[in-house]
Amino acid sequence: SYSDSIEKYNNSIRDLWKPEFENALESTENTNVKFMNFCFHVNQGESPVWFFGMNPSLPISPKEIISQDSDLTENLIGKLKEEQKNMHDEYQYFKKAKDFFKDDVGINELLNPIFHDLYPIRHTKQNEFERFIKDKSLGPLRESLDKATKHLIDKIMPDIIVIANAGASRLIKEIFFEGIDSNSTTLTYEQNGKKTDMIFSSMLSGQRALDTYSRSRLAREIRETWNSRNNK
């Protein structure tokens, strides 16, 4: 089930966090990524559509600061999850994505996308984060995080995954479509007799938000994919 799958995912993130991330920070150079709040996948209820980002931003004034010395107790994990739920309601990133599915896509079944970040490491400047995650001296951290997300999707196999930006799109293709050199905006991932349609966007939100034409085109692509899956 969705709940069981995200519990396993969150446990894997918790277990690798201290040893692997600490080692990654020690081995990489020229990076401003720091050991601070990371991000669990909070239970959002089941939905046929998921919305993938690269990594979560760091709140200006987070309620809980996680350091290398923090003890990840169940109480602290609960506080982190609660803060994330509040962010889903309050942050423009999530509001704009929900508005897009409501106003532009306009399909009742797709009004509540499930948000998931490929890398649950809080850092606001994505160009800095991309340099960090692609650093060849990173060690096993990226591979472990890639596997955690892939195992999660293999278990859930949602109907549609919309990838929010170009950076995340490139990395998702490496994880799920290794060896495929494709500039296609849609690819179908197959596993265990099920199919997930992945739709790659250049930039749905953030500073370089999609222009009106690109939003319309992405919304149309999502509708066409949904209707094709449901023989409409």
What is the role of each PLM region?
Residues 1-16, 135-147, 169-232:
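C-terminal capping/extension of enzyme domains
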Residues 114-143:
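Charged, often glycine-rich, active-site loop that binds/positions anionic groups
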Residues 61-64, 125-128, 165, 170-176, ...:
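A short acidic (Asp/Glu
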Residues 55-59, 119-123, 166-170, 203-207:
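Short, solvent-exposed loop/turn segments at secondary-structure junctions
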Residues 47-49, 105-113, 189-199:
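Beta-strand-turn-beta hairpins that frame and shape the catalytic cleft
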